[in-house]
């Protein structure tokens, strides 16, 4: 784990962490990472839904709508995993939010 390299830094607060604290840190870091995947999938859902709205041809709308359903399944899977298996869902990263807001 890259954070363990801080053990050698003089005065580092992580120098006193025991194994349980490192496990807690790893779980929270994983939860934060998966939360960003969830928000990314929510952004993809939004983008594909807008595509359905934007294209003028009915066949293109049908095709794009299948992608909307796929993205909705991804959102559902990540949300369920975070709710059932992880300790928290973190808010969207400001940089990711900025990208999604530009769409």
What role is predicted for each listed range?
Residues 1-103:
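Non-heme di-metal
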